[in-house]
Amino acid sequence: MADGRASSAQSGENLLFLTDEQLRQGIEAMFFAYRGFTADPDRILSDMAYGRAHHRAVHFINRAPGTTVNNLLNILGVTKQSLNRVLRTLIEDGLVESKVGKADKRERHLFLTEEGHALEQKLSDAQRVRMRMAYREAGPDAVAGFRRVLEAMMDREMRNAYGRLKDSGT
Amino acid sequence: MADGRASSAQSGENLLFLTDEQLRQGIEAMFFAYRGFTADPDRILSDMAYGRAHHRAVHFINRAPGTTVNNLLNILGVTKQSLNRVLRTLIEDGLVESKVGKADKRERHLFLTEEGHALEQKLSDAQRVRMRMAYREAGPDAVAGFRRVLEAMMDREMRNAYGRLKDSGT
DNA sequence: TTGGAATGTCAACAACACTGACATATGCTG
DNA sequence: CAGCATATGTCAGTGTTGTTGACATTCCAA
């Protein structure tokens, strides 16, 4: 199983495809690529009092304005205490606004302020530059495959969340 | 630039391909997929005194037995203090062996013990299960594209490290 | 022999996650 | 209205992983 042969019975067409070696290369590619993926925003954030967690919060609030805390919690997959620490600083610093819900006053709806939008732009611009280069270098067919594999790699709930966001974006 | 149109001048063929919206979907796919990617090993590790950093160390020592601390440092992209804390516990617990170099006695060459191999197997088995399912679901062409985009997303040094590991694996 | 490289270690600190407990306000249901 | 559930916020404690900075040891090479 660890000697380079296929690690499970495969039909002939797959014997040369799903070897442990091929899978391990994919695993390592994910590891190295994710480092690159986060490197640029991380560099920007390290000059401020913010970190990757702030980036994620700002990204998804921008993506789904008016989202509730609970919804954000589900998307980010962290505890409310962890998210709250991040949201508190963002609200204190005037990047995020929290509005009491109209229908249900227990809920808080989150919005980016102008300043919050500015940060989001700065971070996502940096991340898009790399993404655009990678997409252009690899070509449209590769991008389609890239997306298909990533989707298949997600947990079910994350795939659902991803689908909802994808559909909401025009 | 944030209104959904392509964010940089593109030739016609790319106007429908590299919109900010498409790029953002790719960014979110990476985020959600990476969560799935690490979920299974993380679950296993949380039952021990180990974390993701231990997994990474064990993975690359297994991949390149006899690697030096410095080499591992470059691959993992962390400080020696951070790596050392992880290596120390792995050595203390008898999962990793550190051998003084023959040619250069300053160097330490790292190897997995039997117990270390057992943990590596357990972790990478879990990770491969998900990878294999994703690969199978997406198909060979998608996988090729997946790998091409990921490679294009890496920093140069990481792409080099990745290439060396890839070539070393038969 | 001296300088520098490789390694290891100590201390302090920060970011980010977790659990557990508790408070507050609100909504819903009987 | 009473009681329970939900949504949010907060406090305290803890763990993992990363960082800087400082310093010691060992050893190679000029």
What do these predicted ranges mean?
Chain A
Residues 1-48:
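N-terminal leader segment of winged-helix/HTH proteins
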Residues 2-14, 38, 88-151:
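Charged, amphipathic alpha-helical coiled-coil/dimerization segments
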Residues 18-20, 131-141, 161-169:
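Hydrophobic/aromatic-rich alpha-helical bundle segments in the mid-to-C-terminal region
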Residues 34, 65, 76, 80, ...:
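Flexible interhelical turns and helix-capping residues at alpha-helix boundaries
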Residues 39-82, 93:
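N-terminal helix-turn-helix DNA-binding core of bacterial DNA-binding proteins
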Residues 144-170:
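Exposed, interaction-prone assembly regions rather than primary DNA-binding/catalytic cores
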